[in-house]
Amino acid sequence: MLKLDEKKIRKGKPVGLPYQGSKKKISKKIVEIIKQNFDADKLIYDVFGGGGAITAECVLNGLEVHYNDLDNDITDMFQRVISQDREWIKTLIISRDEFNKIRQKEPKSVDDNLKLLVNSFGNELSSYLYGADWSDTKYDLAVEIINKHDVFSGYKQTETYKKADKPYDEGELEKNKKLTQLGQLQQLGRLQQLEQLQQLEQLQQLGRLEQLEPTNYSYEAFSDIEGAIFYLDPPYENTTQKSYKGDFNSQAFYDWAFGMSKNNIVLISSYDISDERFECVYEFKTARSTMQGGGAGKRTEKLFMAVIT
């Protein structure tokens, strides 16, 4: 089993695009595991890079990393965010109507895809973040908070939010009726759109990321690499693979990863691997599956390595 001294984990929040299947919750631990168990001077290949959480964490830790994802839409979004400023980030928040218009639009620009990403439920780009009953109320409130207070985080401390969170507004009967129907006091809760913008701002502030040159290759393109560290986060076995561009053959991938393990350090993220040539080397006991179904919440994230004899 690999070791992890959690006292050495970088302080501060994890960074990366709010992306479906992102490893942001455990990215700091994964990179620290690499640092504590292997030669961190080796080049790290983040081959299924997704929203860039592992890549960004490597950069924050001063490690050399190659950011790759087969889907150029996600790497284009990543590069767009790190090249822009805070005022541009504010333009990404959109209403339900605008979301639906962009969703039907073809072709989509990088900014279009970012707007769908930030404003979609589960960051899956297809359905709006809030239900129909809530969408206008929460969107309008988020826009008002940005315009009046210029904040993404800490929005619950603004007078605008506190006022909106009250169940009654003296003298405004129609508003009171609406608030009562929605159960505003109990349900207003989080304004996820502002929280998403905060994540983008954290990413944008990492100037060192501008030096990255992302690639969009299939994993087989790295077959000739030797003497490196590979962090692999492929589509998991027996799960939906919406976030992966194209079909994915898990067994073919395991064959490739096993071969690569003979001349490289290869770490694979998964819940389980059916191929007996791989063994679990670390388990993130607090990072559980959020997938739907009977097994939801029971499976934990793990790291696997090949057993080379």
What are these regions (language model features)?
Residues 1-45, 49, 53-54, 60:
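S-adenosyl-L-methionine
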Residues 31, 35, 55, 250-258:
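Short amphipathic alpha-helical segments and helix-helix/interface helices
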Residues 40-44, 63-64, 208-212, 262-266:
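Short active-site oxyanion
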Residues 61-209:
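Class I S-adenosyl-L-methionine-dependent methyltransferase module
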